Amino acid sequence: MATSTGEGAAAPKSWTVRFKELPLPLRVLFVTSFVNRAGMFVFPLLAVYLVRSKGLGTAEAGLLISVGSTGLLVGSLLSGPVCDLRGRRDALVAALVLNAVGYLGLGTLDGAPWTYALLLFVALVGMGMFGPAANTLIADLATPEQRPFSYTVSYIGNNLGMGIGPLLGGVAAAYSYHVMFAGNIVVGLLCAVVIRIWVPRDTKSGTAAPKAAGGGRIRLGGVHGHVLWMVLASFFYVAPLIGLEYALPLAVTTELNASAGLVGVVYTVNSVVVVGLGLQLEKRIASYPIRTLLLVAGALWALGLAVLDFGFSLAAVLASTVVWTLGEIIASVVVPTYIADHVDEHRVGRFMALNGFVLGLARLVVPFGLGLIWQNHGARPVLHTMLVTPLVGIAVFAVLRIRSSAASAPAAPAAGPAPASAASAAASSASASASVEAGPGPADAVRSGA
């Protein structure tokens, strides 16, 4: 009879048990990230603020956001070197302080439009630094078996906070834009203090599983080339999200003549789906190849945007949010886990920074491009453009070279004669070939560690 310690009798751990097993600095990171996101009042309503409070046109606001969003690119690029030179903790604290300083100026100063772009640049340098530094900290402290769960928890916390933040921000903005900015700044600085106290400066484990050796540079080919191409291709799944952040508030308030509070409802629906289904999806993605997961993510993105495009209404806005959020969950877990599983520990920070750079690039080009389309052709072509983007991503991931997780490789047989040399060479060749196929999903590390 199997005992409680037998292989087949062990019950799956609850998410609370798995969360408690994570290192304390990671738990602190997840809590502060949630609180910081819940206090992120400004960014989701930035376009509305610039149009209604500062009197800018939609195209001008889009251009200003695009110019200011170069700060995301700079912040993403700075994150890797700062993490390497000063540590993950200092990078996180600096990110929050810069964000607070930029928003302080943006919320209190009146001037020419270029001053708004400059202040937004400073704020978004901080925002661009935070995400890659947080992902690098997770890669440092979480074991390979814990990584998919850790990135899922991080994603859920961020999105739950984003569901609360815009809702509170909308209420604050209805009272006063100054209150909206003040709340954002105070919460960010409090989170910086908590991270400074509870997260150690040096978080490199020094015990990471060996990965493929290679040069320190990020190259289009070579050992880490497949990781680089995956990160770059993820742009096609990031761009629709940025497009929704820019276009949806304007579409809701101008085309549907609804309250800006509905934008907060959309973020809340997004968060409800993430919280309700995120951990369930994390358990199931272990059963599927990475390529399949990425294709399904693109299909869900396309389906959700099709609902919004062809049935443009308040009901369609809410229904589409449920669908595309599922695709967002899958991609947001698969990509950083793939980086952590396949990149040398000393290069993880740079690849996480590159992942953040892709997000920053989307924030740079998407609002400006969609703003021009909206200004010249109206809202519906903007929705058409966003629908096409994940379809392109599906085509790219269908042909991209993708490796399986090293942790999911099958174990060697327990007994049996050694193969002949020719058979051994053939098996070795087959194994090397299989590693480039669409192998098991990144969460297979959880199953293989059981």
Where is each model-derived feature located?
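Helix-loop boundary and gating motifs at the non-cytosolic
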Residues: 15, 19-69, 226-267
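C-terminal ends and interior cores of transmembrane alpha-helices
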Residues: 97-111, 300-312
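Juxtamembrane intracellular "pre-TM" segments in multi-pass secondary transporters
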Residues: 2-23, 200-232
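Helix-to-loop junctions at the C-terminal end of transmembrane segments
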Residues: 75-87, 277-290, 374
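Interfacial helix-cap and linker-helix signal at transmembrane-aqueous boundaries
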Residues: 50-51, 82-83, 171-174, 252-253, ...
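Hydrophobic core of transmembrane alpha-helices in multi-pass small-molecule transporters
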Residues: 34, 114-129, 235, 316-330
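Cytoplasmic helix-loop-helix junction between adjacent transmembrane helices
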Residues: 119-160
